[in-house]
Regions:
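Soluble catalytic domains of enzymes that build or remodel membrane lipids, polysaccharides, and related
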Residues: 131, 136-244
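Non-catalytic terminal accessory segments
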Residues: 1-126
Length: 244
């Protein structure tokens, strides 16, 4: 595990303990949930995160990628809960200044964090929103006037279990009848190369003036700029230190 992974695991562990300790001491939780259940849930979910980082990160296969997805999803939930509970504690002096308000605010923070987590999951699974802009370019050649360029960013695709979602994105791109398509970074998550099923879906993106791309930071995480053929097999031509 790299330094970043170690620091991330330690940070999430601290947030994890804080969230379960502060949520577990809420009056309503203390009355209705046995301590053993809280401890078991806390340890179990922490192990899911650690297993996702240790055994799922950078590995191929449905099980490994599913494990990492579960771990990273739980990390996001913990982060939201931590920020909201910590804010409630700061506002009330951790219960020493405003003890009654602290319990109310902490309970509200937990509820808000869970609701935001559900909203975030929904937003992450829905199709991207299409925004249309008319761009005026001084000196543009007459034969290029009125052309449609579709720009797509931050798809963060990686595994075959998101193939249906990606296929929906490709259908939306094709429905716009683009003259050119540009993929502007973070096309994949970068933990492992895109598999054949993903390449086949990307290959359905077509445009008369070509499908072009640039690398984002997530491509560099997996060393993919050194393997452009993995993308070019899908008909994507990458620009790196050059223009066209």
């Amino acid at each position: 595990m790299h330094i970043f992974g170690i620091v991330l695991t330690l940070a999430v562990t601290v947030m994890h303990v804080y969230v379960f300790f502060r949520a577990g001491t809420l009056p309503v939780v203390k009355r209705t949930v046995p301590p053993q259940v809280i401890i078991t849930a806390g340890v179990g979910l922490w192990l899911v995160f650690v297993a996702g980082r240790t055994f799922g990160h950078g590995e191929s296969g449905f099980f490994a990628r599913s494990l990492e997805l579960c771990g990273m999803t739980w990390m996001a939930v913990v982060f939201l809960l931590f920020m909201l509970i910590f804010a409630a504690d700061l506002l009330t002096g951790f219960g020493f200044i405003l003890p009654r308000a602290n319990a109310i605010l902490r309970g509200t923070a937990v509820a808000a964090g869970l609701v935001l987590s559900v909203v975030g999951l929904y937003q992450g699974m829905r199709q991207p929103v299409i925004r249309q802009y008319e761009v005026s370019v001084p000196g543009l050649a007459a034969n290029l006037d009125g052309k449609t360029v579709v720009a797509v960013s931050d798809l963060h695709i990686e595994s075959a279990f998101r193939k249906k979602w990606l296929a929906g994105v490709v259908r939306r791109i094709r429905s716009l009848n683009p003259d050119m398509v540009v993929l502007i970074g973070d096309i994949v998550e970068g933990h492992s190369p895109p598999d054949r099923e993903i390449q086949n879906v990307l290959n359905r993106i077509e445009a008369p003036l070509g499908v072009w791309g640039v690398f984002g930071n997530h491509e560099f995480y997996g060393g993919l700029p050194g393997k452009p053929d993995l993308f070019e097999a899908s008909g994507i031509r990458f620009l790196r230190n050059r223009w066209t």
